[in-house]
């Protein structure tokens, strides 16, 4: 196994980001770490979140010799990123809600941000809106329940569309033409969201932008050279190595099946004391 790209989230949402990165670097090795024992992150105190994430990620970086960390979680990106960068010597990439491209795309200049309550209320989010969407009317919608609905869909294949419609009623009423998916879990239920909101609302997430940033940083660190070598070897030998790590006591059969379908050959529980 070559030095992997480590993608980190509280749950399965980061798989949407991982999929975008793999489009750009299909032959790289990947580790996916999801801290599902402490899901959802938006309900944790900040210092508890920081301490747990730093310990968990730094331990796995040391174990796997990862060359870059992608924090594929909006809540962790706004809270934990500085501490991770202070404790790691490798690049750390975070998630930024796609406020800027949403404002540029909107014709009506009525856009929305659908995220967890923590992301919605943070000063960083409001700075993004002031900087990049000052010519737009921006509606903010905070909902943790959607995170658990996405997790439930992956675990069971089921989605309560009536409940989803109830949760999205304020979004429908706002008459937006662009909605930013400000949580990496939400692209996992994008089809269902689109069904409720209708074709008149464009959904935007940050996955492609994160993938582009990863490629840029690997190039700047001269690690893209290693990736080109790995790519040549993998084209000759076959599939890249995919490892998944989780923190909960156990995971559902449905989630295990999803991870296998995504290409993970190793699915392992790791323990955390935080």
Curated annotation (Swiss-Prot):
It catalyses: L-glutamate = D-glutamate. It comes from the Bacteria. Substrate binds at residues 9-10, 41-42, 74-75, 184-185. Gene3D superfamilies: 3.40.50.1860. The keyword Cell wall biogenesis/degradation applies. Pathway: Cell wall biogenesis; peptidoglycan biosynthesis. SUPFAM superfamilies: Aspartate/glutamate racemase. The active site is at residues 73, 183. Coiled coil: none annotated. Keywords: Cell shape, Cell wall biogenesis/degradation, Isomerase, Peptidoglycan synthesis. Its EC number is 5.1.1.3. Belongs to the aspartate/glutamate racemases family. Provides the (R)-glutamate required for cell wall biosynthesis. NCBIfam families: glut_race. This is Glutamate racemase. It comes from Shewanella baltica (strain OS195).
């Amino acid at each position: 196994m070559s030095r992997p790209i480590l993608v980190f989230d509280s749950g399965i949402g980061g798989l949407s980001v991982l999929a975008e990165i793999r489009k750009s670097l299909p032959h790289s090795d990947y580790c996916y770490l999801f801290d599902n024992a402490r899901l959802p992150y938006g309900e944790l105190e900040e210092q508890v979140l920081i301490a747990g994430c730093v310990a968990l990620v730094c331990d796995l970086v040391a174990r796997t010799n990862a060359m870059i960390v992608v924090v594929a979680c909006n809540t962790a990106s706004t809270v934990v990123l500085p501490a991770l960068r202070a404790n790691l010597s490798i690049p750390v990439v975070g998630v930024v809600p796609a406020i800027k491209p949403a404002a540029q795309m909107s014709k009506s200049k009525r856009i929305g941000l659908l995220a967890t309550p923590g992301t919605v209320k943070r000063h960083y989010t409001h700075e993004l809106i002031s900087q990049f969407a000052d010519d737009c009317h921006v509606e903010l919608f905070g909902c943790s329940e959607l995170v658990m609905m996405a997790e439930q869909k992956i675990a069971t294949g089921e989605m309560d569309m009536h409940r989803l419609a109830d949760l999205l009623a304020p979004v429908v009423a706002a008459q937006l033409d662009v909605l930013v998916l400000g949580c990496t879990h939400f692209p996992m239920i994008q089809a269902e969201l689109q069904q409720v909101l209708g074709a008149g609302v464009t959904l935007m997430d940050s996955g492609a932008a994160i993938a582009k940033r990863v490629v840029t940083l690997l190039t700047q660190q001269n690690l893209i050279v290693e990736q080109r070598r790995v790519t040549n070897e993998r084209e000759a030998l076959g599939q890249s190595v995919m490892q998944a790590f989780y923190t909960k006591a156990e995971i559902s059969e449905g989630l295990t099946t999803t991870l296998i379908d995504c290409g993970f050959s190793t699915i392992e529980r790791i323990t955390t004391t935080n």
